[in-house]
Amino acid sequence: MGREFLSLFDHWADSYDDTVSGHDEQYEEVFRRYSVILKEIVHRAGQHVLEFGSGTGNLTAALLAADKNVFGVEPSDAMKKAALQKGIPDVFHDGDFLSFPAPPFEPDTIVSSYAFHHLTDEEKKQAIHTYSNILHSDGKIVFADTMFQNQSAHQAEIDKAKAAGFDQLAEDLETEYYPSIDVLKQIFEEEGFSTSFHQMNDFVWIVEAKKRE
């Protein structure tokens, strides 16, 4: 899953929850309506959920609170430790978007929040192909992540971040693999999914991809 970012996850584990709470000005808009975004994923998820990039367990906790059956996949030991320290049940397993243990149930939904951009477009295609083979008809993928309408919109946000002095945000936008909606839609459709996209703030969209018959 772009494990080149693993050291970043380990470093970020202690402060991640402060960031998503809006305490970091550079990422305030990225995480605006964070709790609403998580609730929307939970609302769209089925009963048996495979979650990638569990992180500190915020989405995991929301899914469990809604009585979902959850199998979490997370590559960072520090992130998993932070989740367990918050009292979240240990449903976490080592792995990533591309390499992960099989859950003990047949998932009807695959979810992720703020993580799919760690894969290149080619890796995204590989991952979605794998998920297509896991899910039955009417199964779905629900991902929330930073994405852009097109490359021009992506570049505009980079320029805006630099103008505001948000150097870390600008660097993230330039170096990580944030998808464009048209590319992501094409990948899903080629793998047998119908998609809908829902904008949640200036950066984050939720994509809901349903597997066709």
UniProtKB/Swiss-Prot annotation:
Please provide, alphabetically and separated by semicolons, the GO molecular function terms listed in this UniProt record.
S-adenosylmethionine-dependent methyltransferase activity
Question: Which Gene Ontology biological process is one annotated for this entry?
Answer: methylation
Where, by residue number, does S-adenosyl-L-methionine bind?
A: G53, E74, D96
Has the keyword Metal-binding been applied to this entry?
Answer: no
Enzyme class, UniProt record, top EC level: transferase
Q: What is its EC number?
A: 2.1.1.-
Keywords of this protein's UniProt record, alphabetized?
Methyltransferase, S-adenosyl-L-methionine, Transferase
Regarding protein family, the annotation reads: Belongs to the methyltransferase superfamily. YrrT family.
Q: Which HAMAP family match?
A: Methyltr_YrrT (MF_02100)
Briefly state the protein's biological role.
Could be a S-adenosyl-L-methionine-dependent methyltransferase.
Record-given protein name? Uncharacterized methyltransferase BPUM_2363
Its lineage reads: Bacteria, Bacillati, Bacillota, Bacilli, Bacillales
Gene responsible for this protein: yrrT
